[in-house]
Amino acid sequence: DPVDSGTSQTRAVTNSDGSLTITFDDFDPGMLAGPTSAGENLYSYQGYPQVTTIYDNTPEEYLFLSMFNTVGGSTEYSSGGIALSNWNIRSNQSGNTGDWWYSYLNQCSVYNTAVEAEGQNKEAGHSGSSFGVVYGYVDAYNQAWMAKPEFYFNVPRKLVGLWICNTSYTYGVITYGNQFGSTGVATPLKEMKGYFQVNLECYDANGGLIRTYKRLLADYRNGQQQVDPITTWDYWEINAEGVQ
C-alpha cells in the first residue's frame, strides 16, 4: 500500500503538502485477483478473463500503472508482477490441509493480524480493503527468465515511502519452510540461519537507475541483528536522510 494515508478514504488523495497517497481502493474491482486466493484470473490458462494490468485513474489518469511481465510471449503473474487483492486468509480453511495457507494456492492473501476475523476479504489493507501483492524473485533457477515486477507513475514523481506487509505465503514459508528449499525438506528460515530481503529500484524518466533501497523481511544469520517477519502493515520510508 504505497505512501502513508491518515484516513480510510478509498481514493488516491492529494495531501496538504502536495503529495499523493495511493490506497489501491479506488482501482476497478474487476482487477481484483480471484475467484479464490490463488488468483486463477492472473493466468491465461485457467479459464477466466485474465487480469494482466492494474492502474489508478483517480485523481489523474494512470496515476499508478503496473503490468505483468511477458516472458516467451506469455504474460503471466508467475513471470513477475503486482496483483490487486483483498484476500486475508492466514490459516487453513474448511477442506484445506497441510501447508495450503502458505502455498501458491493462497498467494494473494495478506498476513495482517490486525484484522481479527480472517477470510472476510475486507479491511485487511492499510487504508481500506485492497492492496497490491508483489511477486517476483531472482535466484539460481530463474534469473535467466524472470523479469522484475515494475510499477510506473504518469509523470516523474518522488516516492517517499511504502506501507508493506507480508503475504501469508511469505510469512508461512519464512516461519515453517517448504519443500522447495535447497534440501527438499521444509525447514524454517531461522533454523537455516538465512535471511529474506526485498530490493526496491528507483529509476528516472529515461530509465536510468537512481538508487536501490533494501529491506530485510527476515534475518537469522549469525552475527546479525535478528529480524522477525512483520504481521501488520509497516511503513518503509525512503528518499530520506540516513535511509539505506
Label every model-predicted segment.
Residues G6-A147, N154:
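N-terminal targeting leaders for non-cytosolic proteins
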Residues W145-F151, T183-P188:
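Short secondary-structure capping micro-motifs at structural edges
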Residues N154-G161:
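Extended extracellular/luminal ectodomain segments enriched in beta-structured repeat modules
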Residues I164-T167:
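Short glycine-rich beta-strand segments
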Residues V173-V198:
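Short coil-to-beta strand junction motifs in C2/discoidin
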Residues M192-Q244:
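Terminal, low-complexity interaction segments
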